[in-house]
């Protein structure tokens, strides 16, 4: 945060090659070094009391549920950045902590594939003027991998 080459909230603009849609990003923090360029996004969270051994799972869940990996990939692509970090700051009174989390290349690729799909969907909706609802049929809610691991751990 105190690096002498740190820049804050620089705006970048580009156009998606496939759809022609304009893309705009503004990383909270970026540092361009001779050998790599990195950026970080500061996120305040309210996770309550989290046991240390479960914090990584909770932060990963936060990243996925809020689609932070999509914006991370978009930031890296549009601003030509090599690495992405989140700086999570817990805002619960009396329980302050900070966690710095690097986005793996696999997580960035997942975000990239998901934001590319989303851009295609937006482009199709713009072209057809058909904006589909997020849920179009009833479904059965099932446990995800995170909850299955919790169930397995509690069943032992």
PLM feature spans:
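Metal-dependent nuclease catalytic regions and adjoining charged, substrate-binding loops involved
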Residues: 61-69, 74-156
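Catalytic cores of nuclease domains that cleave nucleic-acid phosphodiester backbones
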Residues: 1-57
